[in-house]
Amino acid sequence: MITKEDFSIDDRVEKMKKPEMGVIVTFLGVVRGEGEIKGMNVEVYEKMAVDELEKLEREAREKFEVEAVEIVHREGSLKVGENIVVILVGAKHRKEAFRACEYLIDELKERVPIWKKEV
């Protein structure tokens, strides 16, 4: 999912919870402020990005023993400290969830047409 609006991690976690899951692993990327950086502009080729994010979610469910996967990425002008991306992976056991989460962030950075420019 691509959005201009901020997201609540708590809300996303609550929506993902299922009785068969023993763990939900989350990765949260935020705008880092170093030196004179005031924020970040995030540009997205939306149609292609949404398609690729959905593909990544399917791949993670197939490659790893996970029950649920969700990726939410922001676009637009973001300030230091604001959320950029959240990845949630629900599974019965933590090892597969952590492996899937790491796979997803690595693949997202390589494959999804999203460009970030510090301002």
Predicted regions and their residues:
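N-terminal, polar/charged subdomain of small-to-medium soluble alpha/beta proteins
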Residues: 1-83, 90-119
